[in-house]
A protein has these predicted regions:
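Conserved ABC ATPase signature
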Residues: 152-157, 161
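Conserved ABC ATPase "signature" region
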Residues: 73, 77, 128-148, 258
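ABC ATPase NBD coupling module
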Residues: 77-95, 121, 243-248, 279-285
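Short catalytic/signature loops enriched in Gly
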Residues: 3, 147, 240-343
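P-loop NTP-binding/switch modules centered on Walker-like glycine-rich loops
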Residues: 179, 183, 187-269
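A short, proline-enriched helix->beta-strand linker immediately N-terminal to the Walker B motif
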Residues: 172-176
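A short, flexible loop at the N-terminus of ABC-type nucleotide-binding domains that lies
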Residues: 1-4, 13-26, 57-64, 82-85, ...
C-alpha cells in the first residue's frame, strides 16, 4: 500500500513548574492510504499529544517538539511548515474529531454555520453552495431532517448527534487523513457502537485514512487494520490487528487484553486490572518503562532500554523477553509459546 503519513522519532516535551514533562519519547509509525490505524494505551501515554503534533497544534511554549523529530505527509516534512502552510493543511488535508463535542463546538453558532465556515475557508464556493454541501454532509453522517437541523445550536442536540456534527465538520473538505481522538468519550455504549460503525462506513466509502486514538482495545477490534500500542510516551508494540489480538508480543499488550471485560465471566469473578501506576514522565525510567509493573521483569529491564524486535508482516515489539538468550517458558505472549490471546 502507498504511504500517506510517516511519524519518525517524534519527541514532545512540556515545560511545567515541576519540570519538563517528556510526553512523547521517540514515537515512530506509518499510515498508508485508505488504512485505519488505532493508537491505544492508558491515559497519559502520549496518544493525544502525538495526534496534536500531526495537526500542528502543539503550542510553544509550553510545548516543545525536539530536534530530530519528523512527521512526513505525502513526503513533506510537516515540522518545517510555516503557519500559513499549517492553515492550508489543517481541515483540507488532515482533519480531527476531538474528544468532547460539547466543548469543541461553538455554542454561539448554529451547526450549519460551523460546517459552512470550514468549507468556505478551504474551497472557493459561494455561501449558498456551502450550505447545500453542509446539508449533504449532515445527511451523510446520519442526521435526520438535515435541512432543519442545520439551524440548531449544539445544546439542542444529543451527545451522539453532536459527535456526528463533529464528523461532518471534519469531512467537510474531504481530507486524506482523519484523526479521531477518543470519539466515543462521554457517550453511552449503544451510541459508541453507532459512532464507530459510522467512522468505519465513511472510511470504506470515501477511502480516507484514519488514525483512531483510544484507550479501549474493544473499540478497535472490528475497525483497525493495524494497531500501535503506546506506554509512557513510547511505542511498545505495533502490528496488524490480528497479530495484536491473537499474537501479542509485549507484556503490556497482553495486560491490556486481559483487562478487557468479557461477557463469559463467572458470577462474582473479579475484573482483571494492571497493578501499579505509569511512571512519572518528568523523570522517566532509564530502562523499560513497563518494568515496574511487569510480572516478568528482569534486572536488565531496569537498567537498559529494550531494543525493538521485528517479527513477521511488520509486527514489532520492544521487550527484552525476545532476546535469544532469554528463557521463554510459560510466557503466553512470546513467539514460540504456541498460545494465543482470545479476542
Amino acid at each position: 500500500m502507498e504511504q500517506l503519513l510517516k511519524v519518525e522519532n517524534l519527541r514532545v516535551s512540556y515545560h511545567s513548574y515541576a519540570g519538563k514533562v517528556q510526553s512523547v519519547r521517540g514515537v515512530s509509525f506509518e499510515v498508508n492510504k485508505g488504512e485505519t490505524v488505532a493508537v491505544v494505551g492508558e491515559s497519559g501515554c502520549g496518544k493525544s499529544v502525538t495526534s496534536k503534533a500531526i495537526m500542528g497544534l502543539i503550542q510553544c511554549p509550553p510545548g516543545e517538539i525536539k530536534e530530530g523529530s519528523h512527521i512526513y505527509f505525502e513526503n513533506q516534512d510537516l515540522l518545517s511548515f510555516q503557519e500559513k502552510q499549517w492553515e492550508k493543511y489543517r481541515g483540507a488535508e488532515c482533519s480531527m474529531i476531538f474528544q468532547d463535542a460539547l466543548t469543541s463546538l461553538n455554542p454561539t453558532m448554529n451547526i450549519g454555520n460551523q460546517i459552512i465556515e470550514n468549507i468556505t475557508n478551504h474551497k472557493n464556493v459561494t455561501k449558498l453552495e456551502a450550505k447545500k454541501e453542509a446539508i449533504r454532509l449532515l445527511e451523510l453522517v446520519g442526521i435526520p431532517e438535515p435541512a432543519a437541523r442545520i439551524k440548531q445550536y449544539p445544546h439542542e442536540l444529543s451527545g451522539g448527534m453532536r459527535q456526528r456534527v463533529m464528523i461532518a465538520i471534519a469531512l467537510a473538505c474531504n481530507p486524506k487523513l482523519l484523526i479521531a481522538d477518543e470519539p466515543t468519550t462521554a457517550l453511552d455504549v449503544t451510541i459508541q457502537a453507532q459512532i464507530i460503525d459510522l467512522i468505519k462506513q465513511l472510511q470504506q466509502k470515501l477511502g480516507t485514512s484514519v488514525i483512531l486514538i483510544t484507550h479501549d482495545l474493544g473499540v478497535v477490534a472490528d475497525i483497525a487494520h493495524r494497531i500501535v500500542v503506546m506506554y509512557s510516551g513510547k511505542v511498545v508494540e505495533q502490528g496488524s490487528s490480528e497479530d495484536i489480538f491473537y499474537r501479542p508480543k509485549h507484556p503490556y499488550t497482553w495486560a491490556l487484553l486481559k483487562a478487557v471485560p468479557r461477557l463469559d465471566l463467572q458470577n462474582k469473578q473479579q475484573l482483571v486490572s494492571i497493578e501499579g501506576m505509569p511512571p512519572d514522565l518528568i523523570t522517566p525510567p532509564v530502562g523499560c518503562p513497563f518494568a515496574e509493573r511487569c510480572p516478568h521483569t528482569m534486572k536488565i529491564c531496569q537498567t537498559t532500554p529494550p531494543p525493538t524486535y521485528h517479527f513477521e508482516d511488520g509486527h514489532e515489539a520492544s521487550c527484552w523477553l525476545h532476546h535469544p538468550q532469554c528463557r521463554k517458558e510459560n510466557l503466553p505472549f512470546v513467539a514460540g509459546g504456541g498460545q494465543e490471546c482470545q479476542k
